[in-house]
């Protein structure tokens, strides 16, 4: 997802939501946000009527790229987008097998 291309996420001043989040939330909060977005789109991929698997997977990948950039920009880790997608795909797989509270 090109955040600058998706103008439906901009306010009346043209500021993108993604830029607002980066300015107003700390590193840990942003990691949580991006992780949940990747997880959401991986779980949803191929299930939402009118949305292809590929479209949702690409959205997950775009958020994973943002997460990798965030981590690398903060020089805390050196994760690749593939690392992140693999890790969060594992979470999505766990969710698909989860039967709820046991």
Regions found by a protein language model. Give the residues of each.
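Intrinsically disordered, low-complexity regulatory regions
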Residues: 1-102
